[in-house]
Structure formats: C-alpha cells, structure tokens
Amino acid sequence: MKTFDELWAELSEKARSRPEGSGTVRALDAGVHGIGKKLVEEAAESWMAAEHEGPERAAEEISQLLYHAQVLMLATGIDLDDVYAHL
C-alpha cells in the first residue's frame, strides 16, 4: 500500500527518468488531451462501481482515478503544493 505522496514521488521519478515500457511514460506522451480522456473514463467507472459494484471495486476505480489525476498534474506542471493550496 502507498500513500498519495508516495505515489506522487514514484510518478515524478518515472516522468524524470522515463523508463522504457512504463505506462506512466506512455500516458504522459499521450498529452493533456489523452490523459484528460482517461481521467473522465476513470471518474465514470468510479461512480458506477460505487453505485453498483460495492466498496472494494469502488476503491479500486478511485485508486486509478487518483493515479490519472497525478499523471495530469505532472503533464501540466502542477505539484502537490499547488493542489494542497486549494484544499
């Protein structure tokens, strides 16, 4: 299990080092539009899982939503402090 901050550190390192075969690198290469489409997809899947599939599936989908939100943050140059300033 990892925290939101630990995920951020991991994804930031992948964005910096760009390891071959990385799904994060592929997502970043898709650009803001591609990442945004994936974020919307994961939001819908989170909602559907919460409404129809139960807490375990909802948690899984929400984890994917958070992952793609962080990838979008990396693609746009937003860091955790930028987001935390609005919480």
From Swiss-Prot:
Its EC number is 3.6.1.31. Keywords: Amino-acid biosynthesis, ATP-binding, Cytoplasm, Histidine biosynthesis, Hydrolase, Nucleotide-binding. It is found in: Cytoplasm. Signal peptide: none annotated. One of its GO terms (biological process) is L-histidine biosynthetic process. GO terms for cellular component: cytoplasm. It catalyses: 1-(5-phospho-beta-D-ribosyl)-ATP + H2O = 1-(5-phospho-beta-D-ribosyl)-5'-AMP + diphosphate + H(+). InterPro entries: HisE (IPR008179), PRib-ATP_PPHydrolase-like (IPR021130). Pathway: Amino-acid biosynthesis; L-histidine biosynthesis; L-histidine from 5-phospho-alpha-D-ribose 1-diphosphate: step 2/9. GO terms for molecular function: ATP binding; phosphoribosyl-ATP diphosphatase activity. HAMAP family: HisE. Belongs to the PRA-PH family. This is Phosphoribosyl-ATP pyrophosphatase. The gene is hisE.
